[in-house]
Amino acid sequence: MGRTFRLLSALLLGLLLINACAPKSEARRAGYAKEFYEKGLSEYRKGDYGDAKSNFEKALNYLEHLTPEQIKKVKYLLVKSAYKDKDYVDAVVYAEDFLANYPGSKEAEEVFYILVDSLVKVAPDPYRDQTYTVEAIRKAKEFLAKYPDSRFTRKVEEVIEEANKKLAYHEYYIAKFYEEYGYPYNAAIRYREVLINFPEYFSEERLAYKYIKNLLLTPKQVKREREKLEDFIEEAKEKLEEVKSPEEKKAIENRIKFLEGEVKRWEKIKEEAFKEAERALQRYREVYGENAYYKELLKLMKKWKS
């Protein structure tokens, strides 16, 4: 009985201590919320956007002690602080968060613009992956549809132009890479994409020349691919003679069938490349005349036919 009483007394004392400390703890958290919020505002007004961003982030750790209007203001100024500090990755993150929570607010239009501009600035140079560039274009078009009379319209149109130029050079560099490393068919496909989608950024005359030239060099790639596939087929046939189980035999036979299909596919690619090169060369002559590029392409065509 005495032991039970002591245990209950200890538990009761613990609860009293917790309850006594709770108001102090909450008061401390409320103090932190106020401190970081006010520091953030002060730093933002002074133009110290990195410090402002840091303080606003800390203030959100105690958001239960901020009013709804203060939370909205913190989230809005977080977007602007990150953007003005050229921390475009965080600007994208905070802009998306703000738009998700306050899509109809008066600040949403500006935040949406910041999101678009930050996406294109996050996007790397044309040599690397352009996922962010594609997303920037998508968001920019969404912005123009949503805010047709926006004060940011001109800037968003400039973002689209900048993003399209990045995509154009990205495609061009891929084509050039394939061309330089001996994959003319792949290069031709990429040059065609540039011709169709981004002709305004390059000399169409030279692009058309490169497209046709790589079509005419396709037999070199086809020969290399065919030889490689034939080696694989020979290896598979040798292995087929060694295996015993029906399952293994079936698997190897299927592999041989697939490889033989690939040989036929490459031969068809060569045929189609020749036909397209003939058509494209005729169009080239009609548009650009019998210039130096045309004469070089004509020699390649005659070499293929011989």
From Swiss-Prot:
Subunit-level organization: Part of the Bam complex.
The keyword Signal appears for this protein: yes
Domain of life: Bacteria
Signal peptide bounds: 1-22
Keywords (A to Z) from UniProt: Cell outer membrane, Membrane, Signal
Protein name from the UniProt record: Putative outer membrane protein assembly factor BamD
InterPro entries: BamD (IPR017689), BamD-like (IPR039565), TPR-like_helical_dom_sf (IPR011990)
Similarity remark: Belongs to the BamD family.
Subcellular location: Cell outer membrane
